[in-house]
Each structure stands twice: as C-alpha cells, then as structure tokens.
C-alpha cells in the first residue's frame, strides 16, 4: 500500500504583488455578476481563490505466486490506484474564482495473470492475460456559466468567474482486455521467440464543453456597459458580449442530456524474433512484427455534411469507418564485445516502431458528427443575454435563429494510420584513462504522425499585406467556405510523415576503491514536429498548431519538448563510521543543467481570418514597420506610447532584437538555462540475526538545494501562458495593441519547482 499527498503553492490571488490583474476592478466585476444572478433568481456565492494545488493518491496491490510444479509457475496480481489532482489555479495574468478550479479524478483497477511453463529442454512459454478498468472524470464547483473578462488592468490581466468550460461534463470510462503469448525455442546458438499481443478496448466518453454556457467580454468597459443595460432593461444589451458558447446534447436523438460517445476497437499483433549468438563476442537480433488495428463501430451519418463534402471534392464522411490495414515493423540490432571483456562494446540497431493513437482523438469523430450535439457560437449579437442559471442556457433568445444548428464536425481520413517511427541508434561503450565511457547517437524519423485541418476555412488568394498595406507580412488570408450552412468548424484528422529528432550523448563514469563514485554526461538534442497534439480535443490541437504561413498545412517547427542541451553530473561517497561495516554513510550531490522550455510568440486575436484565436505566429517588426502599424489606444496607453514601448522592448529582448523583420518561428527560442543541485545523505545500520541481515536506513534528500542557500539559485522558468505560447501583441478590428511598458516580461520563476524541497525517508529491509 502506498499513500501520497503533495501540495503545490499558488502564489497569485486577489491583490497579490506582481499580478497583472487590477484587484479593485476584479472585485467590482464579481459583485456585478452576483447582482445580475440575484436579479435572475439565482444565488451565486463565488469568491476569488488561490488555494494550494493538491495532488494525492492511494495505491494498493496484492500478488500471489504459485509454483504449481517444476515446470509451471502461476502469478496473479491485482492493483488499485485512486488518484486526484487539482487544476485551474490562477497565475500572474489570471484571477479565478474557486469554482473555476476543477479536480481530476482517476480510478484504475488492474488484474493480471501470468503462466510460465517449461514445455521441454528447448521450449518455454509465457502466457499473460489482463483486464484494466479505468474511470476518469473532471469535477468543478457548483454549476455556473464560465465568464471571462480580458484586459482587467493595463497589463492584459483577465478574470475567470464560474466553472472551467471543459469541466462542465467531462468523463472517460475505459475497459482494456489484453492477451499475450510468447513461445521461445532454444535451437543451438539461436533463441527464437514467436508470439502474439492483442488488446481489446471499450470506451465511453462524456464530453460536453460549455454545457452551462460560456461568455467572453473583451474588456471591463464592455462588461460594465452590459451591466448597466441589464439593470435598465435596455434592448440590444448583447452587443457587448464578444463571444458566447453553448453546447448541448440533442435529447430527441440521444435520449440523454449527458450523452456519451461509445465505441470499441482492438489491436492484434504477431511477431517473430531471432537472437543469434554468432560468436562469444557478436550477437545479432532481428525480427518482424505485424500489428492490425480493428474498429468495431462507425460514427453516425450526417447526410447534409456528406453531400456537401462530396460536392466540394472532399473524401470525408462522418460515417467513415477506419480501414484495418496491417502495419509492418521490421527490426534488426547487434552487439559486439571486442574481447568479451566489456572493454569495447559496439551496439546499435534500426527498425520501425508502431504506437497507438490516443483513442480520445478518434472519439471526437463519434461525439461530433453534428447529429448528437448542437453547438452555439455567437459573436456580438444583440440577441445574446447573459443567463446565469446554468440550467436555462437553452432559453437564450439567439438559439432560436442566429446560430441554431451550428455544428462542429470531426472527421478522419478513411486511411488514417496509427503512429509509426523509423528509429536507429549506434552506441559505443569503452574504457580509457581508467574511466568508463559511453557515446551514443539516436535518430528518429516520422513515418506516420497526426495533424489537423479545419476545412470549413480556405485561402482567399490574398495576403494580410494585400488587405492592410503592411506589405512585409505576406501570410495567406482565410475565409469561411460554409457560410449559410450549419457547419461552423470541420476538423479533419490526417497523417503526415514530417518530423524527426536526433540526439548525441557522451557519458563518463568512474568508481574509486575508497567509496567515491563520479558520473557526468552531456546530451545534445534537436526535435522537430508538425503538430504538438497535446490536447484531447481536435479544435485545440488545430488551434495550438501555431503557424506563420498556412493554417491547414503547417510548416515543420521545433517540438514543444525540444531541449537542445542537457548536462548531468553526480558524486556519491560511501564510508563506514569508525570502520564499522554495520554503519554505512552515503553522501551525494546530483546536478542537472538543461536548456529552458521552448516558447513561441504569437498574436492574441485572429490575424488571418481562419477562426483560430492565438495560432498566428508574430512578425517581429522593424522600427520603420512599427511606424506604419495602426494601434488602438486604451487607458494611459496612447497609440504613440505603444509604438515607443514596443520598439524599446524589441530592441532589448535577446532573441527578438536579432530577428527584426522576420517571423517568430514555432518554439524557436528557449527560456534561460536552468541549473539544479540535489543533496542526498543516508545512514544505514545493519545487524545479522542468525542467517538473516536486517537493515534500517534513514535518509534525507534536499531537492534543489541551491535555492536553500540562495533564493535566486535553482530557478525554473515558465511563461505563465498556456503551452508556452506568449501573446504580447493583440490584433482586433484591424488594429494592434501593446499594453505594456518596455519591461514586458516573458519569463517567470515557477513557484513549486523553483523552491527547495526536503524529504525524509526510512527504509527497513530484511
């Protein structure tokens, strides 16, 4: 049994120093929301909160081993994990009410049986079967619409009142059955393994974002103008609401307001491998694997969409069923030990590896056919009313006309394939100068990966420069091609073979007879990909693929996990107190230095008209170009002051000043290099009782010990923007805004990982 509880401090709340949110203004906004709710007969008691984020879990397992006889051994294991994690706390640029914080809950039950059999002197068999039941859910506070107001203060701060919009109805049930059998044949200097690995999945996915309604105001002025009109009963009050979202299940179709998308699939695999000991020093391993995905269900048919897609030359249908195509994975590897004394070992291999797509991506096509769900997305419409009763969103007047029937469609290529990579590695282990060395190179090339298109939008044939006169920015412009049709967004899941990564590493280790162990390593990595695909939603995965050219054909960019430089080192010293071997003391220091997280800079707003807000990479203008850019004044930030501040900020920010007149490429720069030291000390006391040795070990670990010595050491940095996508410039209504001083900050110490942490341990072995 294992129990774990962790708390992560949340440093930013109402009135916290350094926050970008105007505290007095935020309080007035919340009071106005409560007043409007009360006038509508709904009691709302939300307060701004910044509790520490907690993560806790309970784990239990039981294992039974049975030696049936000399030839058969049976093992049965059951394990249970109950885990919870709090999410949705505020940050330096956001202030949230307590009901915006949600809890992620996960319960997993696993039972597995394994039978090992020796069939003959040259044949053995391993049979495994398991069942895994996973129940995941997200819960938030008392149901209430999501209300977001931007620019609460002069530094682009925002407040979130009410539930987090993705957590209003969110749960996933998974049942996975696995069967595996491996038969091994020992034939001379060959070890041949033949086997099968099969998995059967059943999914039930509840996901209805914006179920209680989501309202977005661009600034406090719009919000308070709406509030005054609300109190006065003024017609047309809805024009101040910049965006309204609502989604609900079509109960006449689904029979259930909290409808779940359900589907099943399987992956069947067969393989054969031969490990050939050519000599005492040379070993060759080669084999072939075949995986066959099977899909048991088909999404619902949306006849109007299918007709439109066929007329426009698209090969998509909502009721496409994925093809079951065999995926072949040949592999070969070798290991050569020069003298069979481990003084020089050369090893390597090359092969194709097949993964599986997170099935939640496929579930989007079952949830979003346009049949089971209705989505409403309305911009600045005078029929929008801020309804604060979460159960009365369907009464909103605009649902009867302006957006009734708007559908978000998710489709996939009929020939869509699971992920496949070609991987190769070459390593050398050798001894020189009394040191153990390891040098290794690893290369990976994408064969099949994912990316998304929104085919409801297409290029107009004009560029941003053509339309605005800002000739230096020639990114294509987009327009909706489904106007007059109910299909507001159509996200297509596709395959791409673009992407690669490689790493080069060197490691040195040395152990001394007097108890000192030293190790150091350096790794250089470069990784490029087409689509981050970090979300469970097709819309987010498309929108989070930042680009400076083509939204539906994104360019290759640095991966979100690209950390070019990594240095590791450790020193451990073990000794016996007063030469008494019953008392062993261990003292150690571990160092890790690495490049900071990669980040991108993009515009807040929709620059190219593709309906993606926050996916347009920023053009880094020269001073001459800034003089030609139109700006919108706000508060104390006049147009001229914004131009001056932007010029000064670009001139002193390291990466930006060197790339004026260029686009900021995806993840092209990294936050500052990070240095972390950990300290470890342990005392082990041993005593022999009869033939049994009993040992008690007491340990102390201080993680990020540098921060204990100096508060400015051991910093870990983030941008405080989602996915490290920084938006210093806003573009809306044909004008830009830079609402900051020349000291606009892009890096902030992360409160938890920048602190030192201590851990005491006690271990008893016998």
Predicted regions and their residues:
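Residue-level signature of outer-membrane beta-barrel architecture
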Residues: 66-68, 117, 185-187, 198, ...
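Gram-negative outer-membrane beta-barrel transporters
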Residues: 438-582, 586-597
């Amino acid at each position: 049994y294992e129990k774990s509880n962790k708390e992560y401090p949340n440093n930013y709340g109402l009135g916290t120093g350094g926050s970008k949110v105007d505290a007095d203004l935020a309080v007035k906004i919340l009071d106005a929301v409560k007043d409007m709710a009360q006038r509508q007969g709904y009691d709302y008691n939300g307060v701004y909160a910044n509790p520490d984020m907690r993560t806790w879990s309970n784990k239990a397992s039981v294992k039974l081993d049975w030696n049936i006889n000399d030839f058969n051994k049976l093992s049965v294991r059951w394990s249970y994990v109950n885990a919870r994690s709090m999410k949705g706390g505020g940050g330096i640029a956001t202030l949230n009410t307590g009901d915006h914080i949600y809890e992620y809950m996960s319960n997993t039950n696993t039972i597995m049986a394994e039978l090992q059999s020796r069939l003959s002197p040259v044949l053995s068999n391993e049979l495994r079967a398991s069942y895994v039941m996973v129940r995941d859910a997200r819960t938030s506070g008392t149901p209430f619409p999501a209300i977001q107001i931007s620019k609460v203060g002069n530094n682009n701060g925002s407040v979130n009142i009410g539930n987090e919009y993705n957590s209003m109805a969110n749960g996933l049930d998974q049942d996975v059955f696995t069967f595996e059998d491996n038969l091994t044949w020992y034939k001379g200097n060959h070890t041949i393994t033949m086997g099968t690995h099969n998995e059967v999945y059943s999914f039930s996915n509840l996901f209805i974002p914006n179920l209680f309604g989501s309202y977005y105001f661009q600034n406090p002025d719009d919000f308070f103008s709406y509030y005054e009109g609300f109190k006065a009963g003024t017609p047309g009050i809805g024009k101040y609401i910049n965006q309204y979202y609502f989604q609900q299940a079509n109960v006449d179709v689904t029979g259930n307001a909290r409808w779940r998308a359900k589907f099943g699939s399987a992956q069947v695999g067969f393989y054969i491998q031969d490990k050939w000991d050519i000599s005492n020093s040379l070993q060759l391993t080669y084999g072939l694997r075949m995986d066959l995905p099977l899909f048991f269900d088909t999404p619902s048919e949306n006849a109007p969409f299918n007709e439109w897609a066929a007329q426009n030359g698209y090969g998509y249908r909502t009721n496409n069923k994925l093809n079951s195509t065999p995926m072949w994975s040949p592999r070969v590897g070798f290991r050569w030990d020069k003298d069979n004394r481990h003084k020089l070992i050369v090893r390597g291999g090359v092969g194709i590896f097949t993964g599986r797509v997170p099935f939640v991506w496929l579930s989007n096509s079952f949830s979003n056919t346009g049949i089971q769900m209705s989505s409403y997305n309305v911009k600045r419409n005078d029929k929008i009313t801020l309804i604060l009763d979460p159960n009365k969103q369907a009464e909103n007047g605009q649902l009867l006309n302006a957006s009734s029937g708007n559908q978000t469609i998710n489709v996939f290529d009929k020939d869509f394939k699971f992920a496949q990579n070609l991987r190769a590695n070459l390593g050398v282990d050798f001894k020189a100068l009394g040191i153990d060395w390891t040098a290794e190179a690893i290369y990976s090339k994408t064969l099949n990966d994912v990316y998304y298109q929104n085919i409801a939008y297409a290029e107009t044939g004009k560029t941003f420069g053509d339309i605005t006169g800002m000739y230096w920015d020639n990114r294509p412009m987009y327009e909706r091609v489904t106007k007059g049709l109910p299909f507001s967004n159509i996200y297509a899941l596709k395959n791409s073979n673009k992407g690669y990564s490689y790493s080069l590493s060197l490691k040195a280790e040395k152990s001394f007879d007097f108890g000192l162990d030293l190790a150091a390593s350096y790794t250089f990595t470069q990784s490029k990909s087409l689509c981050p695909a970090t979300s469970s939603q097709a819309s987010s995965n498309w929108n989070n693929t930042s680009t400076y050219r083509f939204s539906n054909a994104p360019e290759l960019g640095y991966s979100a996990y690209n950390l070019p430089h990594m240095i590791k080192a450790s020193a451990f010293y073990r000794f016996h107190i007063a030469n008494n071997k019953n008392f062993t003391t261990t003292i150690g220091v571990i160092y890790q230095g690495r490049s900071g997280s990669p980040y991108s800079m993009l515009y807040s707003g929709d620059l190219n008209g593709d309906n993606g807000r926050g996916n347009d990479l920023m053009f880094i203008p020269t001073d001459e170009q800034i003089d030609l850019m139109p700006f919108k004044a706000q508060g104390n930030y006049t147009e001229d002051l914004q131009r001056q501040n932007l010029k000064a900020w670009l001139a002193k920010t390291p990466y930006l000043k060197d790339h004026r007149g260029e686009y900021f490429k995806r993840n092209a720069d990294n936050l500052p290099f990070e240095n972390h030291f950990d300290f470890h000390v342990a005392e082990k006391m041993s005593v022999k009782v009869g033939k049994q040795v009993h040992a008690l070990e007491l340990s102390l670990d201080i993680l990020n010990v540098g921060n204990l010595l100096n508060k400015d050491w051991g910093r870990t940095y983030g941008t405080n923007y989602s996915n490290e996508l920084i938006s210093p410039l806003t573009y809306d209504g044909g004008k830009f805004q830079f609402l900051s001083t020349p000291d606009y900050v892009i890096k902030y110490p992360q409160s938890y990982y920048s602190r030192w942490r201590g851990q005491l341990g006690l271990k008893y072995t016998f």
